[in-house]
């Protein structure tokens, strides 16, 4: 269940709840955001850390019926915290967006865990025409070992076609585990249809 809207021209909110996650109700996202200045926004609450491309997609934006290995197992982190985002319009069909923040990676539904180390995440998105380039870093400390990640992706979308490739590197400090590497490559061809409530068929 998703609820979102504006309470003022410069203030919006978003709430997303999973009513049955293995028999339990779980709050996925609950945040508020304010437009501080032109292109500059401040957001606070619980939400996905600003990192990754496929991992950053919400349930309503999944490309496939489930998440990829990168989005499900390699990096799937929500946290309670705050972030700043800034969008810079460039010449022509270009745009640069940067965002970053600090988080407590324990969800608001779990109040018994005390986290001493904050998690951090930042990403940059450069769009030029039909191409979107994304890169970012994330540093989390779920236990006694800090884990550092970085990723890069490229998405091309035009007409009915969308192609995307992403790489993610997950490094454990103090050689606690071997470095993990994740790759994702997919293509989607969308065909418009008229079949009841359905208006699109995808071949992936």
Identify what each model region corresponds to:
Residues 1-107, 116-118, 124-132, 184-190, ...:
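Outer membrane beta-barrel
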Residues 115, 125-204:
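Detector for outer-membrane/organellar transmembrane beta-barrel domains
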Residues 18-21, 69-75, 108-113, 139-145, ...:
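Outer-membrane beta-barrel domain signature
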């Amino acid at each position: 269940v998703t609820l979102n809207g504006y309470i003022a021209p410069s203030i919006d909110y978003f709430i997303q709840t999973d009513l049955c996650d293995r028999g339990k109700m779980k709050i996925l996202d609950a945040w508020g955001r304010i437009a501080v200045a032109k292109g500059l926004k401040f957001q606070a609450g619980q939400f996905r850390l600003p990192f990754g491309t496929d991992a950053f997609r919400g349930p309503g934006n999944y490309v496939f019926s489930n998440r990829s290995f990168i989005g499900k197992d390699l990096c799937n982190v929500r946290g309670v915290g705050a972030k700043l985002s800034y969008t810079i319009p460039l010449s022509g069909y270009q745009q640069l967006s940067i965002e970053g923040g600090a988080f407590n990676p324990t969800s608001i539904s779990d109040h018994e865990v005390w986290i001493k180390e904050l998690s951090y995440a930042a990403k940059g998105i450069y769009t030029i025409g039909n191409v979107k380039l994304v890169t970012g870093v994330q540093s989390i400390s779920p236990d006694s070992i800090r884990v550092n990640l970085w990723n890069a992706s490229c998405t091309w979308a035009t007409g009915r076609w969308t192609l995307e490739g992403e790489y993610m590197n997950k490094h454990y400090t103090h050689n606690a585990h071997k470095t993990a590497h994740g790759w994702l490559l997919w293509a989607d061809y969308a065909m418009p249809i008229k079949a009841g409530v359905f208006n699109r068929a995808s071949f992936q």
